[in-house]
Structures are given as C-alpha cells and as structure tokens.
Amino acid sequence: MAAAAAAAAGPVFWRRLLGLLPGRPGLAALLGRLSDRLGRNPDRRRRRSPWLLLAPLLSPAVPVVTSPPCCLCAEGVHRFQWIRNLVPEFGVSSSHVRVLSSPAEFFELMKGQIKVAKRRVVMASLYLGIGPLEQELVDCLESTLEKSLQAKFPSGLRVSILLDFTRGSRGRKNSRTMLLPLLQRFPEQVRVSLFHTPNLRGLLRLLIPERFNETIGLQHIKVYLFDNNVILSGANLSDSYFTNRQDRYVFLQDCPEIADFFTELVDAVGDVSLQLQGDDTVQMVEGMVHPYKGDRAAYCRAANKRVMDVINSARMRQQMLHAQTFHSDPLLTQEDAAAAGDRRPAPDTWIYPLIQMKPFEIQIDEIVTETLLTEAERGAKVYLTTGYFNLTQAYMDLVLGTRAEYQILLASPEVNGFFGAKGVAGAIPAAYVHIERQFYSEVCSLGQQERVQLQEYWRRDWTFHAKGLWLYLAGSSLPCLTLIGSPNFGYRSVHRDLEAQIAIVTESRALQQQLHQEQEQLYRRAGVVSSATFEQPSRQVKLWVKMVTPLIKNFF
C-alpha cells in the first residue's frame, strides 16, 4: 500500500520537494517528469491511489526571480515575474490589448490589417485553406503588395508566410498552389517557408500515407502580424476558422517589441524550413542542414541555436529597455524623467512568449505551464480549455494532485473537428470520449468531483478549437493571467509539434474584465459532465476503439 501511494504521489511530490530548493523553476517540472518515468506502475490500468491527495500538503515555494523585482509592479503580479528568467518580458498598456470573440471578427480584422500594412506582414499557421475566403486573404495580400510597388515612395513591404510542409502540400490543390501566384509576381517581397519535422524521415516517410504523415510532427504556431500589430490565436487560415469554428484570439496593437520578437521567431523557423520556389519546388537556405535528408542531430542543434538566439537576445533587450525606462540614472533631471515617462507610460500588463519545440530540445511552454499548475493555490480557480482533451500525464497529475479548483472545457463529440470524418479519422471523437471517461472515472475515484469539473462545449453547426487557460487567484472574481496560443496541453503539443503561446499577466481591471467575459462566453455554451453523460447512446465507444486508443493517443 505504501509503495503504491508513493508511486501515485511521486510526480507531484518531487515537484513540491524541488520547489523548496533555489534554482530555475523548470527544474521542478523536469524532475517531475523523471519521477513520472521512474515511478510508473507496470499495470497502467490500475487506479491511482487516494494517497495522491497528500501531495498538496507539500507546499511549493514561489520560483526564484533572478532579476530584481520592479517596484512599479503590483504585488499581485510579482508571483509571475519568474517567467522572465526564461523568456523576454514585454510591458505594455492594457489599452493596447483587445480580446476578440468570433471567427468573423478574426477574419475581418486580418483583412483590414493586411490592407493597411506598410512594412511587414508575417503569418504563421498550420496551413492555408483553398476556398473562396482563403482566396480573399491572398487577394488582399496581392493588392497590398501591388500598392506598395506603385506608391510614390515605395514602402518596402515584405510578406513572410510559415506553414507546415506536410499539411500544406496535401492534395493537388493546396496551400502551396494558393501562394504560388504571389511568389511568382513578387519574388523579392514574398517568402513562403514550409517546415518539415526532422522526425519524419527515411523508411517512415516513404511508408506513411499522405493523410497520416502529419501525425509525426507539425509546425503548429499561429501568429498573424501586420507592421507593429499582432494577433495570437489557435486558429488556422481556413474557411471554418473564419465562420463557425470557435477559437480564441487576442489583438496586440502598436506593440513594436512584441512584433519584432515574433517576426524574428518566424524568420528563425523559416530559416530551418524548406523554401517554396516559384515553380512549386522547394529548397533549403544555403548552408542549412536538410530536415529529413541530412543528419538529424546536426539539424536539431542548428534549429535550437537559431531559435534560442532569438529568445535570449530579446530577453536581454527587454531587460536593458526596462532598466533604461524605469531605473534610469539618478542624475537625470526631473524634466528628463518626466519626458521619459511621457514617452513610455508604466505598464499594467506583461506579455511573455512561451515557445515549445521539443524536437529542438526547447520546452519553455511546458516548464511554465507545469509551474503555473503547481503554484495554483487553494482557493484559486483555473479554467482550462482544449479542443482535443488528451492531457499529458504530468498535467493530469498536477490537476489531480494540487489544490486549485479546475473547470475543464472540452469539445463534445458533435463539435469535435473530426466528427463525421471518413475512414479511421471518423473514430477519433470516440477515442476522445474514451480518454475523457477514463479521466472522469479517475476524478471520481479520488473523490475530486467538486474540485475538478469537466464541461463539454456544444453549439449547433459549429466546431470547437479553443485552447488555453484563465487563472483566478484566491478571493478574486476576475482572472489575472491567461495563456493563449496554439498548444492543446496534449502529448503532441508537448513532444511533437512546434508551438507558441503567450502568457498575459495584467493588473488592469478593464482587461481582466475582457478576459473574464471571454471565458464566460465560452463556458456559457457548455454542459457539466456527469456519469449520466457516458450512458448516452452517442457516447458508447466500440471495443476496438478502446483497444487502439492507448496505442495512438500520442499521435493526435
């Protein structure tokens, strides 16, 4: 009994224990994952021991902040400043942050931003669809590029598009063919990069059918950037994401440092990707190792260096900018200080870009997410949403073993993006039901139904793709932090794909209210999951799906 309890509580125990030691916050997550492997029970189907509930008694310490805390920051924000040890911290005014609510608003904003762009358009997505709405976007790009050439004083507009190679090359008409006219007409201004995972190579690449090769790994980042304005989202560039596929979107207006960071990030991934040519061929940047023909280790090292150089240089720039702005030379006159204050008002909101690229040994998002879940205190509320409910073991352990209340929003089978698909893909919603039921059963076996609640999103003729979380501190009716971007909190997001999201920390009541309304709008269309949910005829999972799910759950 004692051995079983230790194995069950192990992952959280080691995170708590390491939290008492000085050092990087990521060490807790790292040791927790090591404990996951060492403490795994050979009989994976056996229920976790109720001793898991003892894990919260090991109270964590707030991760050490190596940078000096800013006296201008509210005390409630201090607890998250450790994130800047890992990534750049961008302080902005909350008036520059707008939360979008609908696919139509997202689509219209993108078109409007493209039309007025003067310097740069940077778009990273899984793929670009081939329908009339997607063509509208391409036409907007073409028109804006044309105007930039005809202007009396050419603006030097540059367009950079990053997509996934496998998804963007599927079928005779695809993302590549949609973008070829732009490349052919504006070869000096347009760049199209197609990321190919280094894990799909050799015999595996030859044998896996086109429809399934994307399961090995993808470019999954979604960022849409226009001059100094940035949209972070989980939405792709496809018609359903512009009409009836619910996602999340945040618009950062006039944020040049953030725009520069994501431009450099997309450029970095683009540099290690295949470059689309005007004749629909692809080639690598000169001197770069090929992702699936070259040495895998050498390619991953080069990619790691390229991306980490962007992250680290931006982090240093922001630290210097922060010091110059808010910790200036005491010999400055009062007039100089006032003038500096006029140029850059004290921020009330902080943006942290969280990058996850496990193929390149970059796991910042994983570290930050695990630490946030570990630090969620008794009385805090975490609203976590994912279109594909398939949490990693580490995330599940933290949800079940920590003290915060959890409201987890997921897609009902009818609004799952694979619902009604042909062939094997049509069984994927049933596999998610099976995973959901297993998790719900575990919650019940631990007596956690009041603290951890599942809710299913449903909306007629819509699908659900929203992901992220909102954190409400104990005693607060509004969130002070949200995560928004591309990760789904599943195995793929952590281990296979390239992901990016941002943590938004704010003390602005107006922005907190925006985030709260966004959360309420999504959860308003949800129903609470109970044991009766799984008794419905539509929730009966075939035996073969139950048997196959453990084997394939790490691929979707």
Curated annotation (Swiss-Prot):
Subcellular location, record wording: Mitochondrion
Positions that bind ATP: 124-131
GO biological process terms held by the UniProt record: cardiolipin biosynthetic process
Keyword ATP-binding recorded: yes
EC number: 2.7.8.5
Residues forming the catalytic site: 220, 222, 227
Coiled coil: none
SUPFAM superfamilies listed in its UniProt record: Phospholipase D/nuclease (SSF56024)
Annotated ranges, domain PLD phosphodiesterase: 215-241, 419-457
Family: Belongs to the CDP-alcohol phosphatidyltransferase class-II family.
Free-text function comment from the UniProt entry: Functions in the biosynthesis of the anionic phospholipids phosphatidylglycerol and cardiolipin.
Name used for this protein in its record: CDP-diacylglycerol--glycerol-3-phosphate 3-phosphatidyltransferase, mitochondrial
Organism: Bos taurus (Bovine)
Lineage: Eukaryota, Metazoa, Chordata, Craniata, Vertebrata
